[in-house]
Amino acid sequence: MIKRERYMQQIRPFIGNELIKVLTGIRRSGKSVMLELIKNELQEQGISNAQFITFNFESLANAKYCTATALYEELSTRIAGVSGKSFLFFDEIQEVKEWEKCINSARVDFDCDIYITGSNAKLLSGELATYLGGRYVEFVIYPFSFEEYLECKKQGQEGQLSIVAEFKDYIDLGGMPFLTNLHGDRRASMLYLRDVYSSVILKDVVKRNNIRDVDLLERIITYVLANVGHTFSARSISNYFKSENRKVAPETILNYIKACCDAYLFFKLSREDIAGKKILSVNEKYYIVDQGIREAVYDGNTRDMDQLLENIVCMELIRRGYTVTIGKSGEKEVDFVAQNGNEKIYVQVAYLLSSKDAVDREFGAYDAIRDNYPKYVVSLDDYDMSRDGIKHRNIRDFLLTDKWE
């Protein structure tokens, strides 16, 4: 188990205070392990095991507590036997009907510190905003970054890792934490990733949104997977189905894709007019949370290397807390405009800069951008081709850089 220090740095200031800590993210991204890491830190501070009260609602043992009233009654009983502050951990809380009422009552009635996890962005919408508005802080937990992937691979392994070889595996298998237990067994990894995908689709998309046409959903997902990092519209998908003699309204397509985004399977990036600093409402792009899932479900990661490298960089920017958009500057496009508070960077991603035309095209994306924020061109090339103040970085080095500036 690695420490996942980037997340712990975000969570640590809130440990022990009255705000409810909400950990969200796609299933199997490591939210339960984060709860264990938090417990470990509390134990190091002198908190006893008797002060921890834990519910995992994926376990049948806790099925009898899957209503707000039943859970609150059980909490009351357990907390009565605790000396001092209670530390409450609820894993996959969305399985509890009207859970927000129970959590809010616990916050008000008991001396406690509350941590919850869930696998859907809707966890923090609707009624929860009414019950807990301003009283919670959210942390999205993602699959392993390349840095975390390497950290995990180094555990229990003698000698130096080959960064180049490991990155090839990372492109293929992705960063779902459990894969480290499979020791690079590709067949087992693909089976596991397909199971994760099926679980997400069934529990967090179909069941949660009452989707009846599962075949249509999966065909839409396949279309999005094929077009990761490419511009498309709901109407273009609708026309695609029309060519196959199937009528599907663009609104239905948008609703299905949004349901997948709510389950943290896809992330939508809007287009930004850099000069006018306006968000445009057309030509969004979608990226998948983990490239290994794409390989398991769709296949072709090595065939679509330009798309996959772009996807990996996009998710790394999001993972580090940046708000990411696609940059439009005149007739040219910058892959990513990433902003985090006062920090801002531009990133252009390419597979290989194998010709002068390729170099001119990628660096030329910045021709009309006159500000002084850092600008990067990232590719698999090892030779540094930086020019005109624009930094060229090998993608492996870029992903392993602690701070971009």
Give short role names for the model-derived ranges.
Residues A121, G126-T231, Y264:
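Interdomain motor-coupling "hinge/lid" segment immediately C-terminal to the ATP-binding subdomain
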Residues T54-G84:
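Short glycine-rich substrate-engagement loop in P-loop NTPases that contacts/grips substrate
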Residues G327, Y351-R396:
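Catalytic cores of nucleic-acid endonucleases
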Residues L23:
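Hydrophobic anchor at the beta1->P-loop junction of P-loop NTPases
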Residues K31:
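Conserved lysine of the Walker
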